[in-house]
Amino acid sequence: MLLSDRDIRAEFQAGRLGLDPFDDSLIQPSSVDVRLDNLFRVFNNTRYTHIDPAQRQDDLTSLVEPKEGEPFVLHPGEFVLGATLERCTLPDDLAGRLEGKSSLGRLGLLTHSTAGFIDPGFSGHITLELSNVANLPITLWPGMKIGQLCLLRLTSPAQHPYGSSQVGSKYQGQRGPTPSKSYQNFVKSN
C-alpha cells in the first residue's frame, strides 16, 4: 500500500521514518521530495578498457565536488553517480521507491537507471544514477529537488531487513554517491 501525505507525516511523528535534514514542506500527496547533495562520482574513461562487474575496479570513478555556489554540468550522453542530500532511514515494514521529478524528466534528466528500490531497514544516503538523454548540457545544482521518495507498507515486517547480518547489506550507512560493489557477491554460472 502506497502511503499518503497523512501516513508519511504520521511515520515521521512516530519516529519510525527518518529523513535528515527533514523539511515538512517537501511532503507531497503520496511522496517526499528529496534534494541533490553536492558530491558526484564521474567515470574515469581512460583507466580501464571495459567495466567488469565481477572485478573490483577502485579507480573506475572519481569523487568530484563543484565549487560552492556552482552547479555540476552533466553533458549529453553522460552518466554520473550523485546522492540525496537527505539521509534516509526506513523501518522494517516500509520500503521505498525513488522516482524522478516530472519537470526534470521533461528536460532529459534521468534520476536512476535501474536501482530505484530501497529495502526496508535501509539507512543512508540514496545513490542516484544520473543520465542526460537531452542534446544540451544540464546544470545540476546542489540542494535542488532531484526526485521523490514513495513509501510502501509491507504486508508484514521483513524477517531479515536490510542491514541485518543475513542479507549482506553492502550499502548500509553509505554517505555520498557510492560506487558499485557488485564484485562482492558476483556469481558466475558454469
From Swiss-Prot:
Enzyme class: hydrolase
Active-site residue numbers: 129 (proton donor/acceptor)
InterPro entries cross-referenced by the UniProt entry: dCTP_deaminase, dUTPase-like_sf, dUTPase_trimeric
Catalytic activity annotation: dCTP + 2 H2O = dUMP + NH4(+) + diphosphate
EC annotation from Swiss-Prot or TrEMBL: 3.5.4.30
Gene Ontology BP term (one): dUMP biosynthetic process
Biochemical pathway: Pyrimidine metabolism; dUMP biosynthesis; dUMP from dCTP: step 1/1
Ribosomal protein keyword on record: no
GO molecular function terms listed in the Swiss-Prot or TrEMBL record: dCTP deaminase (dUMP-forming) activity; dCTP deaminase activity; nucleotide binding
Site (Important for bifunctional activity): 116-117
Binding site for dCTP: 101-106, 119, 127-129, 148, 162, 174
Keyword Lipoprotein: no
Region (Disordered) location: 163-190
Superkingdom of source: Bacteria
Keyword tags: Hydrolase, Nucleotide metabolism, Nucleotide-binding
Annotated coiled-coil segments of the chain: none
NCBIfam families given in the database record: dCTP_deam (TIGR02274)
Quaternary context: Homotrimer.
Protein family per UniProt: Belongs to the dCTP deaminase family.
Function, as annotated: Bifunctional enzyme that catalyzes both the deamination of dCTP to dUTP and the hydrolysis of dUTP to dUMP without releasing the toxic dUTP intermediate.
Protein name, UniProt field: dCTP deaminase, dUMP-forming
Lineage: Bacteria, Bacillati, Actinomycetota, Actinomycetes, Mycobacteriales
Gene name of the record: dcd
